[in-house]
């Protein structure tokens, strides 16, 4: 048995048959070729395993995000796949992203490293105040949340946007002028 690190050059692993293939930081992969080649390589192997280890990323058109969406469907029972073990560390949609105790859901090691959890508090405060790419990076890399974000957003303070929300339907605007 050998442990072999593979480069991103997928041509070098065509026909490769691993018992264990680990795709690390899948969010950074431009395409799904490495995953597909590993998947193809294990199909005739008994008890082979492919593991994808990654944080969330910035590209909602990436193969990693597509796999994430599929895995969420499996976890919710919308899709079925008994051959795949899925573990996604993330907060619930209703969780307040500024509550440090909620961060443990997205970053479970913080349960055992309370100093690291405390160290994240000023980082979060800075990200919230600065907005832009600093906030984006905090949300994606520390809270493991997928977001599509550009730095030239119209509304930088999402609290303002949230406070402006109203519960109206299109029917409420029938007959009204719209610009």
Predicted stretch roles:
Residues 1-43, 164:
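Conserved RecA-like ASCE ATPase "motif II neighborhood" in helicase/translocase motors
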Residues 32, 37, 43-179:
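Non-catalytic, compositionally simple segments
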